[in-house]
């Protein structure tokens, strides 16, 4: 697969002296096509650059993997990994299986937990570089792609945490590469492979299905519609549906709880933005200086008869997320592919302007490095606060509650040791008999998962919660006494006759809504907790 200029339509190859003419005359009028001369993945300079870039990316993420603490969702997924199932209230099953595999292979230390997301980040950079190379890009296009992807704030953030978001861009880019190749050079075997990738990707996040549908719609509206409306598409859909079916069946059996989570989050939690702001926020999401790259990639795709469908798919995806009031970063996994196409266009457009090439890559790298401490744990907390003040940057409001001193992705990694210590002090007030059958009731899954994971060192009772999957795990029996953290007093008084306030959980760096939480010891239940449990359900 290579990108050629308009001269290629007349049979003139873009090599040697003709390459200079092609770059100057028609670099933006690109057709992407596969032929016998497509570059192989031999150890050429571009391919060596790909593997070097992947290793550097992995090393970068591993260097900062233990600076703060376990993130809220990581702790939750550890709990899910100990209760493997075909589905969960708020996510498909793959992430729990991946976390379980990570725990078995590497252990449960913070550094060990961050190995797989670092590898995923390196894999994304490598696949982006290889995609640029297969489009006909040389070492420069490959390098620009890898730098742009590796230092994009979104990719830096998701690559530093073991959540499903670490793998989502890799699934999306893999689908882009496969469909790109299928449009150029149809092969029967690719359709089942596409279905396999979409199906497994949907077990990671349902958004994979949304991207696949956007691609199908985009291709159907493009001149290349005949390349997708073939029997192979039905085969791909059948494979994808078969793989995703167990999770769909689990959701159906439990009353579609994930839809309740999405609906409640839209009504009660998510920060809604206008369509204009949604579009504007795409620029800083992937590094402001990368915006010309992915915009150039979109323009190049629109001019391509074969691949205009990819640009149309992007438009469909953006419109859909705006209509559904999705978060601004929900379309971010599509950008690595667009950056690769834009990097090839940049390489051809600047063939005779080496100074512009050097300046562009230096500017993208410098901007990415400057933003990096705000996206991934690269600085100790005091230094981070000073860096934010120096840049006059405040934490971005991602949900409809007050922001804290640090960005939410960092706040959710802090305060867990203090929470566990607070719970331990409250449990110490229980009698030996009470402690033998006690539980710790929390207001959300992050608190419950933190106590379950970190509480082992103090032999704390199990955590229970009505939040998301913890609700389905139930009250874990009847309890003579309950330590309640972050649960409204009005809720507790409906269930318990004796309620004693014994402390308060505070942490300077967590979100304000998660600090200054009263701690109660509750005794003398009015009814068995199993009967009251349904009143604690909180799908959000």
Question: What are these model-predicted stretches?
Answer:
Residues 51, 115-136, 174, 178:
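Transmembrane-helix motifs of polytopic, lipid-linked glycan transferases
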Residues 133-139, 175-191, 296-305:
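Membrane-interface transmembrane helices that cradle and orient dolichyl/undecaprenyl
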Residues 31-39, 47-51, 128-151, 170:
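Transmembrane-helix signature of polytopic, membrane-embedded enzymes
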Residues 200, 209-307, 321, 374-378:
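Transmembrane-lumen/periplasm boundary regions of multi-pass, lipid-linked membrane glycan transferases
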Residues 127, 148, 167-185, 190-198, ...:
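Specific aromatic-rich, kink-prone transmembrane helix
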Residues 83, 146, 178, 190-205, ...:
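Membrane-interface alpha helices of multi-pass inner-membrane proteins
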Residues 93-97, 107-126, 143, 158-162:
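Loop-to-helix entry region of an early transmembrane alpha helix in multi-pass inner-membrane enzymes
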Residues 154, 160-168:
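Short acidic/glycine- and proline-prone juxtamembrane loop motifs at membrane-interface regions
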């Amino acid at each position: 697969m290579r990108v050629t200029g308009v001269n290629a339509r007349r049979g003139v190859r873009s090599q040697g002296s003709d390459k200079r003419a092609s770059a100057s005359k028609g670099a933006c009028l690109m057709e992407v096509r596969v032929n016998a001369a497509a570059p192989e993945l031999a150890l050429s300079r571009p391919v060596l650059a790909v593997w070097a870039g992947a290793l550097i990316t992995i090393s970068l993420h591993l260097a900062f993997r233990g600076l703060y603490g376990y993130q809220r969702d990581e702790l939750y997924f550890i709990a899910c990994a100990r209760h493997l199932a075909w589905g969960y209230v708020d996510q498909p099953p793959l992430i729990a299986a991946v976390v379980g595999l990570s725990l078995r292979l590497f252990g449960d230390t913070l550094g060990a937990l961050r190995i797989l997301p670092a590898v995923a980040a390196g894999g994304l950079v490598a696949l982006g570089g290889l995609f640029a190379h297969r489009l006909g890009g040389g070492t420069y296009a490959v390098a620009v792609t890898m730098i742009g992807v590796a230092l994009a704030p979104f990719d830096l953030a998701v690559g530093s945490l073991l959540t499903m978001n670490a793998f989502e861009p890799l699934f999306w880019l893999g689908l882009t590469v496969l469909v790109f190749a299928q449009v150029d050079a149809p092969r029967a075997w690719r359709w089942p492979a596409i279905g396999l990738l979409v199906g497994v990707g949907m077990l990671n996040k349902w958004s994979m299905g949304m991207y696949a549908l956007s691609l199908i719609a985009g291709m159907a509206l493009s001149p290349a519609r005949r390349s997708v409306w073939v029997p192979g598409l039905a085969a791909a859909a059948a494979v994808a549906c078969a793989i995703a079916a167990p999770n769909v069946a689990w959701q159906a059996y439990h009353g579609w709880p994930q839809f309740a989570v999405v609906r409640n989050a839209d009504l009660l939690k998510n920060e809604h933005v206008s369509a204009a702001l949604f579009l504007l926020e795409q620029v800083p999401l992937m590094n402001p200086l990368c915006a010309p790259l992915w915009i150039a990639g979109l323009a190049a795709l629109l001019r391509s008869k074969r691949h205009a469908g990819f640009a149309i798919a992007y438009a469909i995806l953006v419109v859909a997320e705006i209509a559904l009031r999705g978060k601004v970063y929900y379309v971010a996994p599509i950008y690595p592919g667009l950056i690769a196409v834009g990097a090839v266009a940049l390489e051809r457009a600047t063939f005779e302007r080496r100074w512009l090439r050097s300046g562009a890559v230096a500017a993208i790298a410098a901007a990415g490095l400057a933003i990096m401490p705000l996206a991934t744990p690269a600085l100790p907390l005091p230094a981070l606060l000073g860096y934010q003040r120096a840049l006059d940057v405040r934490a971005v409001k991602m949900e409809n509650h007050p922001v804290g001193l640090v960005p939410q992705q960092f706040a959710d990694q802090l305060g867990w040791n203090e929470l566990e210590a607070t719970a331990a002090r409250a449990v110490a007030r229980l009698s030996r008999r009470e402690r033998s059958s006690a539980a710790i009731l929390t207001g959300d899954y992050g608190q419950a998962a933190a106590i379950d994971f970190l509480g082992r060192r103090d032999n704390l009772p199990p955590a229970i919660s009505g939040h998301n999957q913890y609700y389905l795990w139930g009250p874990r029996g009847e309890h003579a006494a309950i330590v309640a953290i972050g649960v409204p007093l009005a809720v507790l008084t409906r269930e318990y006759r004796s309620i004693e306030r014994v402390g308060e959980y505070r942490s300077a760096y967590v979100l304000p809504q998660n600090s200054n939480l009263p701690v109660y010891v509750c005794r003398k239940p009015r009814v068995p907790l199993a009967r009251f449990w349904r009143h604690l359900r909180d799908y959000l």
